């Protein structure tokens, strides 16, 4: 089945998944979902649900499974990816957690790899798979490899209420140009970086976007472990016309899906990141 078809079926209105896009009320464009290609669905669900704490729900007439977190959904496509997330424009996805030690221990107990020592910024000291952070709301960071070499960062924020929530996307490539493009295209705001030596940042309601320079060429996302990222957009049809007027070509045209109460379109950023745009994802119930 085509990826577009899988996306639509996965979003069929048979659950309260919309309750997870908590930031949708806070701006015209917010983050919506990660769409992953996975070799083994059961192994993927073990990581995203049992190990890190997502909630598995079944939606639509065919009981399609998606995984929900506050401020993001994860959609899984049963297809072996062409490569992992490292080496692509979207190096990893990030979640904030209330108790990092517990999550790291569950990941290891599930047989998945912690890669904090290899992946943490060089100015972060690592002890027992956790990078020590001693200032601000973040008290620790860790990195894990989900199935199919999907890189995941976990940021400990002890003050948050939820055990886990969507936190950030981390792009690699032409970082200054990328930051400027996402700010101009999606109305993201500039944000002080949590680690200025390693990356620059921008933000949308419910999402931080970090941008690191890459010494090596990076590839686009489509077909890889993180196939595409998704933004929820108010007045999507008008937004797609605005994009076209700005010279941004639609990879798939605006389309209404009345049976699901949503609209969709796709674009690709200048560096190859495949992006789905949705309207109505925040209202599906």
Where are these regions (language model features)?
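Mature N-terminal segment immediately following signal peptide/propeptide cleavage
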Residues: 25-61, 65-67
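Bacterial N-terminal signal peptides
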Residues: 2-13
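Conserved active-site tyrosine of GNAT-family acetyltransferases
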Residues: 44-49, 107, 149, 178-183, ...
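Short, structured motif recognition centered on aromatic/hydrophobic residues
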Residues: 31-38, 54, 74-76, 90, ...
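Short, glycine- and small/hydrophobic-rich beta-strand elements in well-ordered beta-sheets
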Residues: 21-22, 64-69, 76, 80-83, ...
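Conserved acetyl-CoA-binding loop of GNAT-fold acetyltransferases
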Residues: 50-56, 112-113, 184-191, 246-249
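Vicinal oxygen chelate
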Residues: 18-26, 29-40, 65-66, 83-171, 192-196, 200-203, ...
């Amino acid at each position: 089945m085509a990826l577009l078809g899988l996306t639509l079926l996965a979003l069929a209105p048979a659950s309260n998944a919309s309750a997870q896009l908590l930031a949708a009320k806070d701006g015209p464009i917010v983050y919506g979902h990660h769409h992953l290609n996975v070799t083994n669905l059961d192994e993927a669900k073990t990581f995203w649900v049992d190990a890190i704490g997502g909630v598995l729900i079944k939606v639509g007439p065919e009981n399609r499974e998606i995984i929900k977190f506050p401020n993001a959904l994860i959609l899984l496509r049963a297809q072996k990816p062409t490569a992992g997330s490292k080496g692509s424009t979207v190096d990893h996805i990030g979640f904030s957690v209330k108790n990092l030690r517990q999550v790291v221990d569950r990941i290891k107990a599930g047989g998945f790899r912690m890669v904090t020592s290899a992946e943490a910024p060089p100015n972060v000291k690592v002890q027992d798979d956790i990078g020590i952070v001693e200032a601000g709301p973040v008290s620790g960071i860790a990195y894990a490899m989900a199935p199919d070499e999907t890189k995941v960062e976990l940021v400990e924020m002890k003050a948050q209420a939820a055990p886990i929530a969507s936190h950030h996307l981390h792009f690699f490539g032409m970082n200054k140009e990328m930051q400027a493009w996402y700010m101009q295209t999606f109305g993201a705001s500039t944000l002080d970086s949590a680690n200025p030596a390693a990356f620059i940042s921008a933000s949308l309601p419910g999402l931080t976007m970090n941008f690191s320079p890459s010494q090596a060429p990076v590839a686009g996302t489509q077909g890889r472990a993180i196939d595409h990222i998704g933004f929820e957009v108010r007045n999507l049809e008008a937004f797609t016309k605005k994009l076209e007027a700005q010279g941004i070509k639609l990879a798939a045209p605006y389309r209404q899906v009345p049976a699901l109460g949503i609209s969709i379109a796709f674009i690709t950023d200048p560096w190859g990141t495949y992006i789905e745009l949705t309207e109505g994802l925040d209202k599906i119930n």
